[in-house]
Amino acid sequence: MTDYLLLFVGTVLVNNFVLVKFLGLCPFMGVSKKLETAMGMGLATTFVMTLASICAWLIDTWILIPLNLIYLRTLAFILVIAVVVQFTEMVVRKTSPVLYRLLGIFLPLITTNCAVLGVALLNINLGHNFLQSALYGFSAAVGFSLVMVLFAAIRERLAVADVPAPFRGNAIALITAGLMSLAFMGFSGLVKL
């Protein structure tokens, strides 16, 4: 049980996909201008990353390894992610049309989010079992969502703050992301994996 708790805390805080591994920076910078879109993107990404991790582990364990098709792993995972994203898009369109309009082009772009493919590939490379793969995917998504929501809240405050002209816009956003990364480095001694 403690192994799963350490995996969760380690993935969310210590080895955060955005601030430590630098995966998923495109949606991190692109969707984080408003808190509500960041929350929606975080929820959609959480669903996709968790489901994609589970499906990728199942396909790798039951199809690719037994048939000795490991060289097709990346292609198979990209196809799995595309199917999961299409399923998520249909669910979001039916359940929340407002969120669907707010996310706009970013929802289909989850397919190309390197964090989703990264979590699927890292699951296999780290040798996780089924439960660890599901938890790792969920934890990575929770960490991604946490950072995205925190960053969106900070960016909303920065939008009305008196920022010097050369630092307005993306410049202050990158500085803020760097400071967040430094803050998350404080968790580095928390969990030893």
UniProtKB/Swiss-Prot annotation:
Query: Mind telling me which InterPro entries this protein's record contains?
Result: Ion_transpt_RnfA/RsxA, NqrDE/RnfAE, NqrDE/RnfAE_oxidrdctase
Q: Which residues cross the membrane?
A: 5-25, 39-59, 63-83, 102-122, 134-154, 171-191
Membrane topology according to the record: Multi-pass membrane protein
Question: What Enzyme Commission number does this protein have?
Answer: 7.-.-.-
Spell out the subcellular localization from the entry: Cell inner membrane
Tell me, in one coarse class, where this protein mainly resides: membrane
Annotated Gene Ontology cellular components are: oxidoreductase complex; plasma membrane; plasma membrane protein complex
Q: Which residues lie on this side of the membrane: Cytoplasmic?
A: 26-38, 84-101, 155-170
Q: How does it assemble?
A: The complex is composed of six subunits: RsxA, RsxB, RsxC, RsxD, RsxE and RsxG.
In UniProt terms, what function does this protein have? Answer: Part of a membrane-bound complex that couples electron transfer with translocation of ions across the membrane. Required to maintain the reduced state of SoxR. Probably transfers electron from NAD(P)H to SoxR.
Return the NCBIfam families for the record.
Answer: PRK05151.1, rnfA
* Name this polypeptide is given: Ion-translocating oxidoreductase complex subunit A
Question: In the UniProt record, what gene is named as encoding this protein?
Answer: rsxA
